[in-house]
C-alpha cells in the first residue's frame, strides 16, 4: 500500500507543469513568475496615477526588456564582487520609509496593503543598489567635464536663461540603434509622430509610456523627476520655458532616438546669494576588484585605519594605498567640499565625524573609505554654487546619454534568447 501511495505521488508530481522560462540571459534565466510579478507591480503603479491600466500582454515586452537589462547588470555586479550588506539595506529601507513620512513598520504595512511582500521589496531594493553601483563604476566614473566646459556653459545664453529653471517631466523614447538604417530611423520617426498625435487628442501619457517607450523609466509612466532645462537635449530648453504645464513637445531627434516630453510641473530659482557650509576632508579609498573581493577590501581598509590610529601618517598612507586618482597624490586631501556634492553615505559619515577625528572604515558605491575631517566653515558660495550647478547639469546630461549608449551596448553584446510566446526573438 505504501509503495502504491509513493508511486501515485511520483506520478502526480511528474505531471505538475514546470515553471516556464521566458528568457535566457547569458548565464542566467528569467522565469515567467518574475515577469508576471513585475507586470502586476507596474499595473498597480499605473493605477495609482489614475491612468487606464494596460492589459498584461501589452506590458510584457517592456517588462521583459527591463528584466533582461537588470539581469545583465546584476551579473556584472556578481562578477565584480559588488555586495550590499544587510546593514546597508536596512539603512536604505529606512531612508525610503522616511521619504514617504513613514516608520519602517508603517512602510511594511503599506506594502502589505498593496499586496506586496516586504521581503520581496527588500530584495528589489538590494538589486537596485547593486545596479546603481555597477553603473557608478561602468558609466559615471568615465564621465569628465572640463572647467572650460563649465565656463562656456555659464557664459552661454542657454546657461544664463535655463540654469535656475527646473521642470518636472515625463518622457517617451522611440529608440534608434547606433547603426540604424535610414528606413529604421524613418519608421521610428513615424511611430513617434503617431504617438504624439494620440497624445494631442487626449491619450493617456502614462499608459502610452508604459507600453511604447524604450526609456529606462517607461514602466514608471516615463517620469523623469525634476530636471534643469540645460540637462536636456538642446531642442527642449526654449520649448519647455514657453510651454504650459500639461502640454507635450513634438518628437525631437536625439542621439538615442526620438523623444516626446510632457511638462508636469515647472519652477524657477531667484538667483539670490547663497551661503554654504563646507568641510575640509581627506580620505583613503580602497576599491574591490576582480582580484580583491569585498571582504578582502574591507579588511585592507581596516588595517589602514589601525595604522593611522597607531600613529602612521595619513597622507603617506593615502599616497601608498588610496585608489582615488583625484586625491591620492595629495595625501587624500579633497580640500573644502560642499557636503551636498558627495554621495549620501560619504556625506553622512563626514557630517557625523567631529573635526580633527578619524572615521571608521565605511562603504559607498565607490568602495571602502577612511576619512578625516580637518575643518568646517560657512562661506558665501554664490559663484561656486553656480559653477557646481553647471557642472552637475553638464555631468547629468552626459550621464543620461552615456547610460543609454552603455545599456544598448551590453544588451547587444549579451546572449539573449527570448522564449516568451509571440515576442520578437533576439538571440545572439
Curated annotation (Swiss-Prot):
Q: Which reaction does it catalyse?
A: [protein]-peptidylproline (omega=180) = [protein]-peptidylproline (omega=0)
List the molecular function annotations (GO) for this entry. peptide binding; peptidyl-prolyl cis-trans isomerase activity; unfolded protein binding
Query: Which PANTHER family has this protein been placed in?
Result: CHAPERONE SURA
Which GO biological process categories is it annotated with? Gram-negative-bacterium-type cell outer membrane assembly; protein folding; protein stabilization
Naturally occurring in which organism (per UniProt):
Pseudomonas savastanoi pv. phaseolicola (strain 1448A / Race 6) (Pseudomonas syringae pv. phaseolicola (strain 1448A / Race 6))
User: Pfam families, from UniProt?
Assistant: Rotamase, Rotamase_3, SurA_N
Q: What is its EC number?
A: 5.2.1.8
Protein name (database record): Chaperone SurA
The encoding gene: surA
SUPFAM superfamilies noted in UniProt: FKBP-like, Triger factor/SurA peptide-binding domain-like
Top-rank taxon: Bacteria
Compartments it resides in: Periplasm
What's said on domains? The PPIase activity resides only in the second parvulin domain. The N-terminal region and the C-terminal tail are necessary and sufficient for the chaperone activity of SurA. The PPIase activity is dispensable for SurA to function as a chaperone. The N-terminal region and the C-terminal tail are also required for porin recognition.
GO terms for CC? outer membrane-bounded periplasmic space
The reply to whether Isomerase figures as a keyword in the UniProt entry is yes
Domain named PpiC: residues? 164-265, 276-375
- Gene3D superfamilies recorded: 3.10.50.40, Porin chaperone SurA, peptide-binding domain
Endpoints of the signal sequence? 1-13
- Which function does this protein serve? Chaperone involved in the correct folding and assembly of outer membrane proteins. Recognizes specific patterns of aromatic residues and the orientation of their side chains, which are found more frequently in integral outer membrane proteins. May act in both early periplasmic and late outer membrane-associated steps of protein maturation.
Keyword list, A-Z: Chaperone, Isomerase, Periplasm, Repeat, Rotamase, Signal
Amino acid at each position: 500500500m505504501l509503495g502504491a501511495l509513493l508511486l501515485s505521488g511520483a506520478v502526480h508530481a511528474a505531471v505538475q507543469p514546470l515553471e516556464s522560462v521566458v528568457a535566457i540571459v547569458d548565464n542566467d534565466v528569467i522565469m515567467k513568475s518574475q515577469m508576471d510579478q513585475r507586470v502586476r507591480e507596474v499595473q498597480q503603479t499605473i493605477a495609482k496615477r489614475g491612468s487606464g491600466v494596460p492589459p498584461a500582454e501589452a506590458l510584457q515586452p517592456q517588462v521583459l526588456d527591463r528584466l533582461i537589462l537588470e539581469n545583465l547588470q546584476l551579473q556584472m555586479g556578481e562578477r565584480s564582487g559588488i555586495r550590499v550588506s544587510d546593514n546597508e539595506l536596512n539603512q536604505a529601507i529606512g531612508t525610503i520609509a522616511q521619504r514617504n513620512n513613514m516608520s519602517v513598520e508603517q512602510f511594511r504595512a503599506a506594502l502589505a496593503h498593496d499586496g506586496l511582500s516586504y521581503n520581496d521589496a527588500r530584495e528589489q531594493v538590494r538589486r537596485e543598489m547593486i545596479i546603481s553601483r555597477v553603473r557608478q563604476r561602468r558609466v559615471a566614473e568615465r564621465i569628465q567635464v572640463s572647467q572650460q566646459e563649465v565656463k562656456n556653459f555659464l557664459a552661454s545664453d542657454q546657461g544664463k536663461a535655463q540654469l535656475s529653471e527646473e521642470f518636472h517631466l515625463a518622457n517617451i523614447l522611440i529608440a534608434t540603434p547606433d547603426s540604424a538604417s535610414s528606413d529604421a530611423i524613418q519608421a521610428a520617426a513615424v511611430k513617434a509622430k503617431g504617438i504624439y498625435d494620440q497624445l494631442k487628442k487626449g491619450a493617456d501619457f502614462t499608459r502610452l509610456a508604459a507600453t511604447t517607450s524604450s526609456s529606462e523609466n517607461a514602466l514608471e509612466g516615463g517620469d523623469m523627476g525634476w530636471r534643469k532645462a540645460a540637462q536636456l537635449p538642446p531642442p527642449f530648453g526654449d520649448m519647455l520655458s514657453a510651454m504650459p504645464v500639461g502640454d507635450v513637445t513634438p518628437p525631437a531627434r536625439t542621439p538615442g532616438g526620438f523623444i516626446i516630453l510632457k511638462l508636469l510641473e515647472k519652477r524657477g530659482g531667484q538667483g539670490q546669494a547663497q551661503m554654504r557650509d563646507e568641510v575640509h576632508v581627506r580620505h583613503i579609498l580602497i576599491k574591490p576588484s576582480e582580484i580583491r573581493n569585498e571582504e578582502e577590501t574591507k579588511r585592507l581598509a581596516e588595517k589602514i585605519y589601525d595604522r593611522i590610529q597607531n600613529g602612521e601618517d595619513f597622507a603617506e598612507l593615502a599616497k601608498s594605498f588610496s585608489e582615488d586618482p583625484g586625491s591620492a597624490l595629495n595625501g587624500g586631501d579633497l580640500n573644502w567640499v560642499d557636503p551636498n556634492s558627495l554621495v549620501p553615505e560619504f556625506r553622512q559619515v563626514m557630517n557625523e565625524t567631529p573635526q580633527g577625528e578619524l572615521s571608521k572604515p565605511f562603504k559607498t558605491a565607490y568602495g571602502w573609505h577612511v576619512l578625516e575631517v580637518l575643518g568646517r566653515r560657512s562661506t558665501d558660495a554664490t559663484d561656486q554654487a553656480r559653477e557646481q550647478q553647471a557642472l552637475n547639469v553638464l555631468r547629468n546630461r552626459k550621464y543620461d546619454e552615456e547610460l543609454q549608449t552603455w545599456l544598448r551596448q551590453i544588451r547587444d553584446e549579451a546572449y539573449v534568447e527570448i522564449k516568451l510566446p509571440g515576442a520578437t526573438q533576439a538571440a545572439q
